[in-house]
């Protein structure tokens, strides 16, 4: 029985952009901080972030037209409210106002990924990579996740590793790499990296689901149950929770059957 639990469709949610609500602020410099703080893939000094200081606004951010910033902010807001289709209207407007707006192209890719539009997502991520000169981690993660969705794991691996060079602290990125390695059947590497991802981000439920898949492939039902329990503690009502509970029951039956076989063998004279 194939018990693998698929997380592919959740990549779009995994790559969504967290926001800081700034509805009452109208100063253009403040508005531009949305660009710096919005995506999850920035590489600012963690010590500066931990002290709560805002990164300085670069000359590039200051060069972005106000209309582009406002459209981008609206697009990110719609994306955060689970309206990827609605976000695209604003994000496309932002990119038309500022053609090198690589953050907007990246967000478009995330929206298209969540809508299940693979080719459109790929084009948007590639535009973001090109516009940033390859120095922005977000679209590399997005493209790698898309390729994992398409089971193009060999192609995905170097792209994800490039993203991790740019943003090594992004926990979900390590999970995406582990997913690619799992797809390549490099189970030891996948297990190590998925475990590291779960430590980097203790709330990253999908890392436990991937570890469960690794143990399913190894027929290690005891460890599978440990990871499924961890996943369900974090996501008791998640989109894959029903599958996880079915896998739990299957693993328990397999373990019970193993115990019966062992006891029968021990009872033989």
Predicted regions and their residues:
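Structural signature of tandem alpha-helical TPR/SEL1-like repeats
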Residues: 80-93, 114-127, 149-162, 183-196, ...
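Canonical tetratricopeptide repeat
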Residues: 107, 141-142, 176, 210, ...
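Bacterial N-terminal signal peptides
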Residues: 8-16
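Terminal, low-structured helical/coil segments at or just beyond the last alpha-helical repeat
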Residues: 27-38, 44-47, 52-55, 59, ...
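Structural marker of alpha-solenoid helical repeat scaffolds
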Residues: 97, 131-132, 166, 200, ...
């Amino acid at each position: 029985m194939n018990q693998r639990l698929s997380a592919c469709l959740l990549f779009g949610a995994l790559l969504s952009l967290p926001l800081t609500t700034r509805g009452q602020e109208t100063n253009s410099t403040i508005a531009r901080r949305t660009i710096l703080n919005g995506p999850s893939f920035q590489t600012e000094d963690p010590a500066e972030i931990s002290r709560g200081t805002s990164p300085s606004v670069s000359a590039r951010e200051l060069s972005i037209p106000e209309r582009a910033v406002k459209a981008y902010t609206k697009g990110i807001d719609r994306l955060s409210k689970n309206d990827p289709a609605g976000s695209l209207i604003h994000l496309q407007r932002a990119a038309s106002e500022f053609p090198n707006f690589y953050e907007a192209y990246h967000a478009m890719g995330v929206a298209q990924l969540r809508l299940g539009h693979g080719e459109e997502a790929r084009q948007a991520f590639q535009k973001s990579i090109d516009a940033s000169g390859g120095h922005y981690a977000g679209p590399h993660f997005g493209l790698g996740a898309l390729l994992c969705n398409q089971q193009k794991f060999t192609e995905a691996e170097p792209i994800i590793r490039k993203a991790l060079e740019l943003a090594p602290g992004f926990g979900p990125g390590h999970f995406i790499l582990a997913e690619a390695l799992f797809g390549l059947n490099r189970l030891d590497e996948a297990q190590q990296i998925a475990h590291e991802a779960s430590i980097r981000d203790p709330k990253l439920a999908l890392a436990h689901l991937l570890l469960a898949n690794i143990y399913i492939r190894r027929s290690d039902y005891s460890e599978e149950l440990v990871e499924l329990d961890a996943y369900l503690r974090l996501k008791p009502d998640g989109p894959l929770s029903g599958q996880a509970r079915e896998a739990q029951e299957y693993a328990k039956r397999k373990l019970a059957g193993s115990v019966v076989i062992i006891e029968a063998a021990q009872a033989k004279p």
